[in-house]
Amino acid sequence: MKKIVLPSIVMLIYSTLFAQHSLEKMWESDSLTLRNPESVLYDSKSNSLYVSSMSSGTIVRMDIDGKVIKKDWITGLTSNKGSALFNGLLYTAETSAVAVIDVDKATIVKRIPIEGAQMLNDVAVDSKGIFYVSDTRAGRVYRIEGDKPSVYLENMPGANGLLTINTDLYVLTSTSFQKVDANKVITKISDGFESGLDGIVMIGENEFVISNFQGILYYVRADGTKQLLLDTRTNRIMSNDISYNSKTKILYVPSFGTNRVIAYKVK
């Protein structure tokens, strides 16, 4: 009897630790409003989405069901991509500057230029209001404190998606997923991905979903184990800078080439 029960227990523990995740498609937005959506950001305060419509230099505001609240919520941006919220302000990356937007007034209040920037991409902010901005073309990450930018990390090929958790900064290069602590000690979490990693969200303790703009979504644990969640490359549906609603477990995925945002339930 013991010889039967013990393997059963082992298999139960194994299946619990390495349970497979899946995505269930909930909705997709229309393809007429957005022009090359590069990034989507969920705002828990307003329970809405801010979508960077890169080719039109605008931010489109949507509800959590993909319906447009305001098409031209913000205009006059230049190749806008990733965004982050802090104290009622939305910070969005342009080509060589970070635009600062007053959310309540829906106006651009200032820009923070970054000298030497080549292609700013994603933005993340920590609890102290210190911002981090990736420069994909230069392979750098900048740090902005008190509106003063400085080079924080270099030699990060294709630096793109950023995420702050406590004192750690998580960084996606083109093919790897890394953690950088407060002393700038770099730990490689997982690598060997196909070139084109883009966005990153945390979906649980030590659990992440990362995107590859070509059209791939991965589930990754902090110990480096990973699982392919979705591959839509054959349908030419891209997966760019993603966002996540932890209460509803909905993942929001902008698709640059098809001009849509697609929502998936994470299971």
Feature names for model-found ranges:
Residues 54, 95, 136, 172-174, ...:
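Short loop/turn segments immediately following the C-termini of beta-strands
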Residues 57-59, 98-100, 139-141, 177-178, ...:
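Structural signal for beta-propeller blades
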Residues 62-67, 102-107, 144-148, 181-185, ...:
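Short loop/turn segments that connect beta-strands within beta-propeller blades
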Residues 241-267:
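Blade-level signature of beta-propeller repeat domains, shared across WD40, Kelch, NHL, RCC1
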Residues 32-46, 75-91, 115-131, 155-176, ...:
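Beta-rich, blade/repeat-based domains predominating
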Residues 24-31, 67-74, 107-113, 148-154, ...:
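A short beta-strand motif characteristic of beta-propeller blades
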Residues 1-24:
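Bacterial Sec-dependent N-terminal signal peptides
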Residues 91-144:
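Hydrophobic alpha-helical segments and helix pairs
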